[in-house]
């Protein structure tokens, strides 16, 4: 199905059912009305772990596969794109980036770590006619700085946590005309600070929203001052308590569900992203419905985003193996994950064992720490009264 085509939900669900028999069975079990989105089952992490991420998927056509960090099973996720999925993704990202950048930019650099966006960034910029430098995330941070200062890109595509680390060195000596961000939550205040640092306007910073499962999802529309969903994505935002009945969240946000009409080789029908979204709205623009939101507060429930994702199940397992029966919560400090544990003291060997277990399950994070792109994992002792919330159930 092509982007912008009038999309028939029932036909699309039938296509997904034909590709994924387990999903067809799910529809039969639920007795779902295929023409009503709200009647369709939710695609959760649990279902995908059982049927997709580690399954021997068989597809009728050529495909591309990408790995991301571990799930509750301890294995890395594998996500598939058909040739058509890939084509639509590349075209959509290129259209957004080209519209943002305009003409006259000849050099582009991507420093994105791992994943689908990192693997395709070079192709997008080359199609725009740019000379391209792709920085290998395994390089030490000094080499990232050397490439940037030598190449002096007009367009710099990176992740907020990487950019923070680069700026903190005080050694950057280039002035990009456009900065494109992807990955971590980048508040407008944070974007403004980045613009000030590089002596550019806030409108010259573009924040993209995407995931390896869906691909391109949304972008910050400076004219609207809101994030705008891509045209082939049908978003829903549902109350937190509808998915997590025990949650005590009382804010204005809700959990984002996504249905994509541009993903043949992923069951993107009411996919539970676990992203907490505020200010969700829709309006009619030129005869078509446009969906927008004010901001993403981060990831709710089972994952703590640390560039890639360090799964809360991994953290729970590491603590259970090495320091059981202690309350804990999580924080960020200087680009690194902090695990705050209710304890008077923790032996050094226990701290190292916890970190070893986490990094063994998340090798991409281990490499990024080694390269100096993100801060090391810290274990901090605190009084039990300082522990905030039950992170085994939620995190945002």
Curated annotation (Swiss-Prot):
Q: GO biological process: what's one of them?
A: antibiotic biosynthetic process
Q: Name one GO molecular function term.
A: ligase activity
| Coiled-coil positions | none
Pathway the protein takes part in: Antibiotic biosynthesis
Cite the EC number. Answer: 6.3.2.46
Reading the lineage from the top rank, the first entry is Bacteria
Keyword field = Antibiotic biosynthesis, Ligase
Q: Which SUPFAM superfamilies match?
A: Acetyl-CoA synthetase-like (SSF56801)
Q: Is Cell inner membrane found in the keyword set?
A: no
Known catalysed reaction(s)? (S)-2,3-diaminopropanoate + fumarate + ATP = N(3)-fumaroyl-(S)-2,3-diaminopropanoate + AMP + diphosphate
Cite the InterPro entries for this sequence: ANL_N_sf (IPR042099), CapK_Type1_Caps_Biosynth (IPR053158), DdaG_Ligase (IPR048223)
- Asked if Repeat is a keyword of the record, the answer is no
Question: Which cysteine pairs are joined by S-S bonds?
Answer: none
Function, please? Involved in dapdiamide antibiotics biosynthesis. Ligates fumarate and 2,3-diaminopropionate (DAP) to form N-beta-fumaroyl-DAP. Can also form N-succinoyl-DAP from succinate and DAP, with lower efficiency.
Under which name does UniProt file this protein? Fumarate--(S)-2,3-diaminopropanoate ligase
Species source reads Enterobacter agglomerans
Source lineage: Bacteria, Pseudomonadati, Pseudomonadota, Gammaproteobacteria, Enterobacterales
């Amino acid at each position: 199905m092509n982007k912008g085509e009038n999309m028939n939900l029932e036909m699309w669900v039938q296509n997904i059912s034909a590709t994924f028999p387990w999903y067809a069975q799910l529809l039969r079990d639920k007795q779902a009305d295929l023409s009503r989105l709200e009647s369709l089952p939710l695609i959760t992490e649990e279902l995908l772990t059982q049927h997709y991420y580690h399954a021997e998927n068989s597809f009728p056509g050529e495909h591309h596969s990408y790995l991301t960090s571990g799930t509750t099973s301890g294995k890395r996720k594998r996500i598939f794109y058909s040739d058509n999925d890939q084509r639509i993704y590349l075209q959509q990202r290129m259209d957004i980036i080209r519209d943002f950048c305009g003409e006259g930019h000849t050099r582009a650099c991507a420093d994105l770590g791992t994943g689908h966006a990192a693997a395709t960034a070079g192709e997008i910029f080359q199609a725009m006619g740019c000379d391209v430098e792709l920085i290998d995330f395994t390089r030490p941070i000094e080499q990232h700085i050397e490439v940037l200062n030598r190449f002096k890109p007009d367009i710099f595509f990176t992740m907020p946590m990487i950019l923070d680390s680069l700026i903190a060195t005080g050694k950057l000596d280039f002035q990009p005309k456009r900065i494109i961000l992807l990955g971590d939550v980048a508040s407008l205040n944070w974007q403004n600070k980045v613009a000030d640092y590089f002596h550019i306007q806030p409108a010259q910073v573009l924040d993209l929203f995407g995931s390896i499962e869906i691909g391109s999802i949304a972008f910050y529309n400076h004219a609207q001052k809101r994030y705008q969903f891509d045209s082939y994505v049908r978003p829903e935002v549902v109350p937190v308590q509808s998915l997590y009945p025990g949650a005590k969240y009382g804010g204005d946000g809700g959990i984002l569900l996504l249905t994509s009409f541009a993903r043949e080789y992923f069951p993107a029908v009411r996919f539970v992203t676990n992203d907490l979204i505020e200010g969700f709205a829709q309006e009619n623009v030129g005869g078509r419905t446009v969906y927008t939101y004010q901001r993403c507060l981060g990831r709710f429930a089972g994952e703590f985003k640390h560039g890639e994702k360090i799964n809360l199940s991994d953290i729970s397992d590491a603590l259970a193996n090495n320091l059981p029966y202690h309350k804990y919560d999580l924080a960020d400090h200087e680009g690194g994950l902090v695990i705050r544990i209710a304890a008077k003291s923790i032996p050094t060997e226990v701290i190292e064992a916890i970190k070893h277990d986490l990094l063994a399950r998340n090798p991409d994070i281990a490499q990024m720490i080694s390269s100096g792109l993100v801060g090391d994992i810290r274990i901090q002792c605190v009084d039990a009264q300082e522990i905030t919330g039950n992170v085994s159930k939620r995190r945002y």
